[in-house]
Amino acid sequence: IYAALMGGFASLLWLGSCSSFISVMVFGGHLKPIGLYGILGYIWVAPAAIIGLYIGAELMLPEKKKFIVIIYSILSIIFELLLFVDFLFFDPMKSIEFETSGSSIDSNFVYGHPIFILIVIFLVSVLLLNGIGSIHKAIQSTGIVRKKFGLMSLFFIIFVLVAALDSLLTPGPILFIIRMGMVVCAFLVYFALKP
């Protein structure tokens, strides 16, 4: 159930993109204010990270699971506060760069901003705890369990890679390949969790 929740929250990271697309199609223009695009997409980082890192802690450090979840919950609260405070009281363009071209919006975190640093911490942690943790469990297991942990490790590694590239690169042909990587991730997690 935790992996399904994590996957659900991770898929909501594209809610800003989808909402903007629908806004352009229905109303003929982008979401207003533009910072709403970032809020709708990035509000889901914290719950996805907490649940994902709970799974990773269970795989790698079950005896320290509670401590890890508390630490990442605190970091997630800080992330959410920074996201909303920036949106409500300041200029969201200081933490997230928005580039509009025609009917699409691209958003990237501003390098060095605390929100960017927290995203990097979350992604590296998921890679280490979940990606390496799944590889570790796959090595310890046999048969179908080994295969499922192998698929989970591929999912986490590819997800971190394409999520990082998606937020770093500007739109272009390579973005299609990155988004297809997300589609591959959906299939990997499905087959890893399928009974």
What are these regions (language model features)?
Residues 19-30, 85-93, 163-171:
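Juxtamembrane "helix-exit" motif on the non-cytosolic side of transmembrane helices
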Residues 55-57, 84-87, 186-195:
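Membrane-water interface at the C-terminal end of transmembrane alpha helices
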